[in-house]
Swiss-Prot record:
Residues 116-204 are annotated as: DNA-binding. CDD domains: SWIB_BAF60A. This is Brahma-associated protein of 60 kDa. The keyword Transcription regulation applies. The lineage of its organism: Eukaryota, Metazoa, Ecdysozoa, Arthropoda, Hexapoda. Keywords: Developmental protein, DNA-binding, Phosphoprotein, Transcription, Transcription regulation. Changing R185A: Loss of DNA-binding. Does not affect function in vivo. InterPro entries: SMARCD1_SWIB_dom, SWIB_domain, SWIB_MDM2_dom_sf, SWIB_MDM2_domain. Involved in the recruitment and site-specific anchoring of the Brahma complex at specific promoter sites. The Brahma complex is a multiprotein complex which is the equivalent of the yeast SWI/SNF complex and acts by remodeling the chromatin by catalyzing an ATP-dependent alteration in the structure of nucleosomal DNA. This complex can both serve as a transcriptional coactivator or corepressor, depending on the context. Participates in X-chromosomal dosage compensation. Participates in neurogenesis. Residues 1-124 are annotated as: Disordered. One of its GO terms (cellular component) is euchromatin.
Length: 515
């Protein structure tokens, strides 16, 4: 019965039916092979039976061992997803668990079933990274002090969540303009140079002239960062500067001195104007601030209504919306419409308008902001330098913004954290390895004989997979192996296959074809 036969051709349709299988019987394996712990098809004409490894008798914890509960045959078959694939993959030479064919098929099934998107992979990688830092429950039971480490992990997760939330808050805050008001002190000085007559020594004479300087600097408010070394240039606060001199003295073509910002403008610490003259000069200095973001001056009627003189467009729209809500001007039925009161009707020249029309209707009511006007008097005959000071309010970037940017861009702490995480992972891996070694030697110390027996069985199973040896020759050479219930079905299947094979050969020889 242990003789090896090559599988025949596919059985043809026959009117003879195979004998019904006895309950609890298993398919007959090829000679030299034993059964894997899997299910099998009940009809013999579906596939070839699959060889495999037999259960090892007398070893606790192994399927089929007396006295040790284990899953039934069909349950074990249902638990193995590669069962049908391994059946379809068997060929003439026979192969199964021992031959490596079924193992290869199951590996392919696992590889095909494990595909996923990049986001799933990233999420799995993050979970794996977190799981690598957690100590197993057995280690925590053995070492009660390890609970302190687990508490630190919980605290670390909460801290990471808090830091991430704060980083998001900072990123949102940086999207909005962060300004603070500072005092800019403007120094306007003039120096008069009297005329000089030419001398006999060859020195040339000089015409009487005067020089006007416009300079400035930010005043320290005591709240700024003392480590800030970058100082803004005076010209960076302004969009344009115009010095208007007396038109009667310098004519219509030479009485204006203008400076306007361009994309290629080089910032400077001040402006200087020099003109000839020995008479008192009245000049007007016009300074237009460079607002970032842009600000607009409201129409006087709207400014009185909202209490806003010069502001940015979002602030103006927000103030108008507050006025509408306060006076309940929004239509009760059509919420997108606004019913203008007598003041808004005079300003917008309409009784009713949509809220979406407000920005468009505001455009004619918004004007460029007024420049800062300084009247200065240049007195002739005074050889000493005369200086006048003026303080104006300007908006500068909040110093906290630079600290926020440096916090978001800093990577030194992240690198340090990654290094510490690597050390933690290595330490946890070492602990897990020591736990495995402890269980290994503890099992050996409790029952050396049974431990070595199990070890040999495990190594034999691995060796069988590596060497592609089918079946279990040690069991097959004993008579008890063939007194199991599956032998009855195996004999029936064998004779059924041989009869079908002979029938097919006879029909082929006689030229009989089945329609």
């Amino acid at each position: 019965m242990s003789q090896r036969f090559a599988p025949g051709q596919a059985p043809v349709q026959s009117r003879y039916q195979p004998p019904p299988p006895a309950p609890g019987m298993r398919p007959y394996p090829p000679p030299g092979a034993s059964f894997p712990p899997r299910g099998f098809p009940l009809h013999p004409n579906t596939t070839q039976p699959v060889p495999g490894t037999a259960n090892v008798a007398g070893v606790p914890g192994v399927p089929g061992v007396p006295g040790v509960p284990g899953p039934s045959l069909l349950q074990r078959a249902a638990q193995q997803p590669g069962f049908q694939s391994s059946l379809r993959g068997t060929g003439a030479g026979g192969g199964g668990v021992g031959s490596g064919g079924g193992s290869k098929r199951s590996n392919e099934s696992r590889s095909l079933g494990g595909g996923g998107s990049k986001s799933d992979f990233a999420t799995a990688k993050k979970k794996k990274k977190l799981a690598e830092k957690i100590l197993p429950q057995k280690v925590r039971d053995l070492v009660p002090e390890s609970q302190a480490y687990m508490d630190l992990l919980t605290f670390e997760r909460k801290l990471d969540a808090t830091i991430m939330r704060k980083r998001l808050d900072i990123q949102e805050a940086l999207k909005r303009p962060m300004k603070q008001k500072r005092k800019l002190r403007i120094f306007i000085s003039n120096t008069f140079y009297p005329s000089k007559e030419p001398t006999n020594d060859g020195e040339e004479g000089a015409v009487a002239s005067w020089e006007l300087r416009v300079e400035g600097r930010l005043l320290e408010d005591g709240k700024g960062d003392p480590n800030t070394k970058i100082k803004r240039k005076f010209s960076s606060f302004f969009k344009s500067l115009v010095i208007e001199l007396d038109k009667e003295l310098y004519g219509p073509d030479n009485h204006l001195v203008e400076w306007h910002r361009t994309h290629t403008t080089q910032e400077t610490d001040g402006f200087q104007v020099k003109r000839p003259g020995d008479r008192n000069v009245r000049c007007t200095i016009l300074l237009l601030l460079d607002y970032q973001p842009l600000q607009f001056k409201l129409d006087p009627r709207l400014a009185r209504l909202l209490g806003v003189h010069t502001q940015t467009r979002p602030v103006i729209i927000s103030a108008l919306w507050q006025y509408i809500k306060t006076h309940k001007l929004q239509d009760a039925h059509e919420r997108e419409y606004i019913n203008c009161d007598k003041y808004l009707e005079q300003i917008f020249s309409c009784q009713r308008m949509k809220f979406a029309e407000i920005p468009q209707r505001l455009n004619p009511l918004l004007h460029p902001p007024d420049p800062i006007v300084i009247n200065h008097f240049i007195e002739s005959g005074a050889e000493n330098k005369q200086t006048a000071c003026y303080d104006i309010d300007v908006e500068v970037d909040d110093t906290l913004k630079n600290q926020m940017n440096s916090f978001l861009m800093s990577t030194a702490s992240q690198q340090e954290i990654q290094g510490l995480d690597t050390k933690i992972h290595e330490t946890v891996d070492t602990i897990n390895q020591m736990k495995t070694n402890r269980e290994f030697f503890l099992s050996f110390a409790k029952d050396p004989q049974m431990f070595i027996h199990r070890w040999i069985i495990s190594e034999t199973r691995d060796l069988k997979l590596m060497t592609d040896v089918a079946g279990n020759p040690e069991e097959e050479r004993r008579a008890e192996f063939y007194y199991q219930p599956w032998t009855h079905e195996a004999v029936s299947r064998y004779f059924f296959t041989k009869v079908n094979q002979k029938r097919a050969e006879l029909e082929q020889a006689l030229g009989i074809r089945n329609g």
